[in-house]
Amino acid sequence: MPISVSEPHLSFNSLSLIWPDGTPCFENLTGAVSAPVTALIGDNGSGKSTLLKLLAGTLEPTSGSISRPGTVAYLPQDLGLTPQTTIADLFAITDVLDALTALEAGDYSEELYDRIGDNWDAAEQAQAALAASGFSPALAATDARALMRRTVGTLSGGEAVTAALTALVATRPGVLLLDEPTNNLDADARATLYRLLDTLPCPVLVVSHDRDLLERVDEVLELRQGTLRSFTGNYSAYRQAIDSEQDAAARHLREAKQVERQEKRERIEAETKLARAARAGATAQANRRGSRMSMGLAASSAQRSAAKIRQTHQGRLDAATATRKARERDIREDQAIYLDLPGTRVPAGKRVLELTLRQGTGADSSPYQGEQEQADDGAAAATPLPERLIVQGPERLRLAGANGSGKSTLLRAIMGDAQAADTAHYTCDYRVANTGYLPQRLALPQDQSMLQLVMAANPTLTEQQVRDDLARLLFRRERVHLPVGVLSGGERFRVALATVLLASPAPQLLILDEPTNNLDMASVDWLIQALASYEGALLVVSHDEAFCAQLGLTDVLTLPKHH
């Protein structure tokens, strides 16, 4: 049964975190989680994931306090799993299964019974929970214990997330913390997650850029420039509140600028009057007869009066300027990018990519999707694949399919990964030489700056040209010298894309594997704008429907699930 809004289940007061080098992550954050589902949003690098780690207890704050309601379950972005981690490890039943195996082999020691306790059907219960979550291997498995022995390395990214999340929920936590839980999930898995969030008996705090998920939350916490703010309602309600604020802020800024201009005019007018009065006074004194003392006193009095007038006008102008600057800080920066990439242009008839998609007659090579299995991303079931796929000119193709259908494997095979090519169900017959590829897991030198990386990718550009291009991608001033290792996940993605787009020779085919994973809403908008400037062919794997809807796709290819 869904929970209702109540007293805070998780709260924190005056929370601060200072990194070892003295850099503050944030200071004096105070807030609470009491709604059924609360979203934590903010720009990349604002500290969202760090705040979750503090609340989960995996990171200690520099100062401040956290009140936790018993057990806090935490699902990090990268899951923190090794390829050898088993499903049994996720459910913490490995020891129980080992004891059951030993017992069945003829070892009847008392210690084994103690290890098993009341958990004789632990594997079956875990399988049932996974099946209820739409975990495909659980639906197909006939041996629960064999399923539990499967390693994470044999699962797709979405299957691993589903298994880890299901295991967390099975612990019945007091609060559930999720960091980008829908990354790598196909449409069916996302729908299952949404249903799960609607029925959880504990409050959830989730970091996500998934627009569909954000529309289902009950409260939004925004972490921006070290300040945490709360908004009642879903993401649309939050955006409406922010838009109203920005309209008011723009109006207040116009008014402040008008007042500042008026104060400047009045200051100039006052100075003009004072100058005229001073000249008139000097002329009068030159024509007046009297003691030097009396004339000096009169001049001194006039100077004091002028100084007082100047001080009054300057004070009013300073106050108006301070107000104008404060109003400017209330305006959120325009994050529009301006990029010209003529080198990526591809002639309409030029062959860019060629794939063989239908091979043999076995079940694994069937060109049709299963009748009972709806394809990922809303594609119709049983859609036939063409025998060959040829991408020509600046076409934009989305590669869709359920988790485990081999999308990422196909991309790696296209890029020449021999191991992926051996396991892929499809063959890459041709790929244009100038191809840029961004995999799900980026590998960038942590000690190099974005300026160094882009200059290495394009030695024909001067440092100033690179800085100009990076500025158009919103990397400005001294930020271009920061080492990649200190950047957020979203910023690292932007650096990786910059090195690809600005490379020499320019890419005529751009391949992106789940590019919006780990990106905040502003960075997703940034990516959409960057791709609008790109004039080559595009091949993208993404479960982000809102993102794909804005790419100007020319076709969608849905891969069947291979069992």
Question: Where are the regions a protein language model picked out?
Answer:
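Coupling and communication elements adjacent to P-loop NTPase active sites across diverse families
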Residues: 2-15, 96-151, 157, 244-360, ...
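Conserved A-loop
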Residues: 16-17, 23-33, 66, 386-392, ...
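ABC ATPase nucleotide-binding domain signature region
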Residues: 37-38, 50-113, 393-465, 543, ...
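ABC-family P-loop ATPase nucleotide-binding domains
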Residues: 81-154, 439-499, 503-508, 514, ...
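GG-anchored amphipathic helix commonly corresponding to the ABC/SMC/Rad50 NBD signature/C-loop
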Residues: 157-177, 415-416, 491-511
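Hydrophobic anchor residue at the start of the ABC signature
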Residues: 165, 193, 497-499, 516, ...
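Catalytic Walker B motif of ABC-type/P-loop ATPase nucleotide-binding domains
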Residues: 176-180, 185, 509-514, 519-520
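Flexible loop/N-cap segments at domain edges
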Residues: 322-368, 373-442, 458-460
